[in-house]
Regions:
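Active-site nucleophile loop of the alpha/beta-hydrolase fold
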Residues: 16, 47-50, 97-106
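Short glycine-rich catalytic loops that host catalytic nucleophiles or stabilize transition states
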Residues: 45-48, 161-167
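Gly/Ala-rich beta-loop-alpha elbow adjacent to hydrolase catalytic centers
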Residues: 75-84
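Short beta-strand/loop motif that positions the catalytic acidic residue
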Residues: 129, 134-137
Length: 187
């Protein structure tokens, strides 16, 4: 991984599929407000193709509209975590926090059509293109087996934070996540 820098970071929230409007879903708007209160710029806007979250649509949007670059921190939740990982195969970012990440389509056709799972993951490139990688996993996630998160953590060397929540991190706030981001960006 790259050495951690202390320049001002921008946070980009990459939601799970189906989370639209984004500001009414889960902890996304709460995180944006909380970061703004701490002086951190945060992009939290509706994604194109919000239900299927196709890689061919999301990655150009993240690069071109969200302006992902070497000073951005990606916060990817569920499908957004997979989008973050695929983006980091080719794009340098400041870091990423992956929430409820997986590495397979779990045998679910609607996940397979997203395009994230149709080839091997480039784990080494992901690591090389980020200064830090943190991962939150629910040991009792109703959608993603915990073993999926462990596989991602083992391949990326993430700082794996495991919680027993049974909710796929689908809550209205997420104080631990805010604390993690602030610690990683040096604020």
């Amino acid at each position: 991984m790259l050495p951690v820098t202390m320049a001002a970071a921008r946070v980009l929230i990459l939601p799970g599929n189906g989370c639209t409007p984004i500001k009414s879903a889960n902890w996304y708007a709460w995180l944006q407000r909380s970061l703004k209160d701490k002086g951190v710029d945060c992009f939290c806007e509706n994604m194109p193709d919000p239900h299927e979250a196709k890689e061919s649509i999301w990655l150009p949007f993240i690069r071109d509209t969200m302006k992902a670059d070497s000073n951005c921190v990606l916060v990817g939740h569920s499908s957004g975590a997979e989008a973050a990982m695929r983006l980091m195969e080719t794009t340098k970012v400041r870091g990423a926090v992956l929430v409820a990440a997986c590495h397979t389509d779990l045998g679910i056709e609607s996940e397979a059509i997203s395009g994230y799972y149709n080839r091997p993951w480039q784990w080494q490139k992901i690591k090389e293109n980020s200064e830090f990688l943190v991962q939150y996993a629910d040991t009792d996630d109703p959608f993603i087996p915990y073993e999926e998160a462990v596989h991602v953590a083992e391949n990326l060397g993430t700082e794996l934070i495991s919680k027993t929540r049974s909710d796929h991190f689908m809550t209205q706030d997420f104080p631990d996540l805010l604390e993690t981001i602030m610690a990683k960006i040096g604020k």
